[in-house]
């Protein structure tokens, strides 16, 4: 469902704004520091309950204010509007409303508002540690497997308890009860992740080939422990090692998505522009797979569109996004940088000093 209206209050340098949106492309044009990234950040907050730039609530609430509000309205398939909103206080408390009902959970926001973010720091998906790629996988599994969210949360709680027990246990028998449930959850989580990658990777490899035709892309899922050994057996066999480490070494919390081009890790081959295109391809592939599996459309947030991309690459990305039919929000310093994306269905907003005006 596309956002039809966005209301932001007391968020960073945006005192208040109320804008009507296009179901297609929405362009935010303005100089650095004008507030265009803050609009994307506010939409992200609406879908995730947190900022993508700061984990500290106080930093996104406007100075001398005690709270912020972000509200949105969606048009569903019957063209009825569904309101959603989030209010965050400086003390860290949060209130979520969906359809006018208070007390909703952040996970429900994410279900209603599936978002894909592409921003200048997004290279970490390819160049940093496995946690970024686990988050990438888990975004997809969360939206396609209803049991995943609770199972993953329970596994993390049990893993924390197990790590505490490792410090005091005199024998493995003291952990065996916990390990049975951990193993059951781990096997389920791994199966869901593996299935997701198998289903999504054909789409991802095809789009990557379109963006980077000179390379052959390979995606391979690693589950976090030996693929031929049951997880409970791993836990028992590695008990003494885990004790000496003080934590559980193997498990779904160590899973990774290994990405190579022409058989070599991507970070050793691709330029920054090529890395950005690869990130874009993977994000678009996730959105397309989501639509194929659930009928939901993803909303794309693209910050600093022209960064690292020449005009030819910008056109490739623009054409691919247009083909999805999804709602897209793009920030850019000048209109020239988004010329390939402009059409009659798009909407242009000029942003300056936190004020947002529609053309």
Swiss-Prot record:
Gene3D superfamilies, A to Z: P-loop containing nucleotide triphosphate hydrolases (3.40.50.300), RecF/RecN/SMC, N-terminal domain (1.20.1050.90)
GO terms, molecular function: ATP binding; single-stranded DNA binding
Protein's cellular compartments: Cytoplasm
InterPro entries: DNA-binding_RecF, DNA-binding_RecF_CS, P-loop_NTPase, RecF/RecN/SMC_N, RecF_2
Pfam families (alphabetical): SMC_N
GO biological process: DNA replication; DNA synthesis involved in DNA repair; double-strand break repair; SOS response
PROSITE patterns xrefs: RECF_1, RECF_2
Residues reported in the UniProt entry to bind ATP: 30-37
Keyword line: ATP-binding, Cytoplasm, DNA damage, DNA repair, DNA replication, DNA-binding, Nucleotide-binding, SOS response
GO cellular component assignments: cytoplasm
SUPFAM superfamilies associated with the record: P-loop containing nucleoside triphosphate hydrolases (SSF52540)
ATP-binding listed as a keyword: yes
Family statement drawn from the similarity comment of this UniProt entry: Belongs to the RecF family.
Biological role stated in the UniProt entry: The RecF protein is involved in DNA metabolism; it is required for DNA replication and normal SOS inducibility. RecF binds preferentially to single-stranded, linear DNA. It also seems to bind ATP.
Stated name of the protein: DNA replication and repair protein RecF
Species name: Vibrio parahaemolyticus serotype O3:K6 (strain RIMD 2210633)
Source lineage: Bacteria, Pseudomonadati, Pseudomonadota, Gammaproteobacteria, Vibrionales
Gene: recF
């Amino acid at each position: 469902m596309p956002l039809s209206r966005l209301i932001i209050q007391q968020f960073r340098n945006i005192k208040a704004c109320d804008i009507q949106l296009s179901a297609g492309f929405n362009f935010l044009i303005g100089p650095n520091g004008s507030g265009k990234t803050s609009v994307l950040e506010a939409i992200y907050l609406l879908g995730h309950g947190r900022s993508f730039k700061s984990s500290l609530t106080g930093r996104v609430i406007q100075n001398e204010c005690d709270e912020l509000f972000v509200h949105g309205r969606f048009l569903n398939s019957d063209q009825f509007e569904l309101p959603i909103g989030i209010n965050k206080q400086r003390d860290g408390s949060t209130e979520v409303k969906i359809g006018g009902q208070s007390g909703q959970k952040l996970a429900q926001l994410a279900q209603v508002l599936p978002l894909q973010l592409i921003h200048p720091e997004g290279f970490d998906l390819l160049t940093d540690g496995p946690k970024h790629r686990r988050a990438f996988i888990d975004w997809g599994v969360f939206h396609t497997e209803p049991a995943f969210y609770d199972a993953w949360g329970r596994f993390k709680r049990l893993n924390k308890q197990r790590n505490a027990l490792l410090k005091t246990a005199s024998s493995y028998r003291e952990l065996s009860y916990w390990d049975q449930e951990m193993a059951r959850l781990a096997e389920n989580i791994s199966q869901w992740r593996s299935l997701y990658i198998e289903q999504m990777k054909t789409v991802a490899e095809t789009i990557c080939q379109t963006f980077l035709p000179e390379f052959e892309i390979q995606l391979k899922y690693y589950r976090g422990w030996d693929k031929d050994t049951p997880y409970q057996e791993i836990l028992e066999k590695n008990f003494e090692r885990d004790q000496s480490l003080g934590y559980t070494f193997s498990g779904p919390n160590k899973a990774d998505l290994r990405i190579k081009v022409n058989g070599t890790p991507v970070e050793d081959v691709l330029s920054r522009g090529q890395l950005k295109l690869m990130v874009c391809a993977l994000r678009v592939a996730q959105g397309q797979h989501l639509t194929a599996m659930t009928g939901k459309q993803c909303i794309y947030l693209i910050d600093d569109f022209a960064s690292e991309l020449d005009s030819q690459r910008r056109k490739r990305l623009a054409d691919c996004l247009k083909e999805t039919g999804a709602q897209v929000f793009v920030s850019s310093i000048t209109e020239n940088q988004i010329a390939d994306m402009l059409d009659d269905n798009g909407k242009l907003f000029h942003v300056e000093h936190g004020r947002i005006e529609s053309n």
